[in-house]
Amino acid sequence: NNNLFIHAGFSSMHGPEKEHYKTNYSWDRTLCEMALTMDKRIKKDSLSYPKRLLLYNEIYIGHTPTLHYNVEVPMQGCNVWNIDTGAGFYGKLTCIDVETKEFWQSDAVQTFYPAEKGRNK
């Protein structure tokens, strides 16, 4: 099905295999930011369409909590799905069915561990 599952992202227009900085797999937020802010009028066959988005049918990422956008559910921009809903902070843990896009969420993680501050320290 040519989907990619990666923690954060990648910056190489040739894909993660050609990534110059391997730390981008864990830290890159440009893929998410680009997908969310893309001009919807740019068609996939346009020379302006980002090449790295054409490499996969869908790309599933985390690392950038949707809470940064005041959203508590998975977000989609182009073919990029961000399913990090902030469980490391005060959000919920989320899983998604990649075929149907149905998703399930826990209660806020801190309700299970009230004494644990997580990344909210």
List where the protein language model places each region.
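Acidic, His/Gly-enriched loop-helix segments that form or flank divalent-metal centers
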Residues: 1-81, 86-91, 98, 102-109, ...
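Nucleic-acid-processing active sites and adjacent nucleic-acid-binding tracks
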Residues: 113-121
